[in-house]
Amino acid sequence: FDPTTGMSDEEKKKFIDKLYKKIKSGKKLSADEMQYLRMNDPVTYAKMAKVQIQRKALESRLKQAKSKEEALEIYTSAKSRISDDDPAREELNAAYDDAYGEFKKSEQYKKLPATEKEAKEKEKNGTSRSSWNKDITGDTKFTENEEETYEFGISGDFEGEE
């Protein structure tokens, strides 16, 4: 099934223009867009099938990052592994840039500590940004570790706290 079936010439042109703009900008492609490529541009389809799979793999690795620093390392490492002679080099670079940009906008990224050192300290101390509790009166209470940290003026990065 060709997704452009039943479209006017103008609608087809818009669909195709939008599709190739998405490819150039590294955006995710819909099932209809992939189907169109499979039927009408098999070379680009093969490239984009690979790009979409590798983009998903990068997104998955980014979600496992324990710090913003680690997320950046994952992204730069993925980009550095793109071969100069890869026929999908341009599309992969755009997809990785887009995936990393989208991840940086996410709540998950905003809640990550800045460095791996901070992430390890939080893990070691058992503190997390969501460990605040409310007592019966509605007052915010710190967990024991956070209270000690607060008392000694070594406050953690609580940016983005909900």
Regions found by a protein language model. Give the residues of each.
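Type III/flagellar secretion export determinants
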Residues: F1-E162
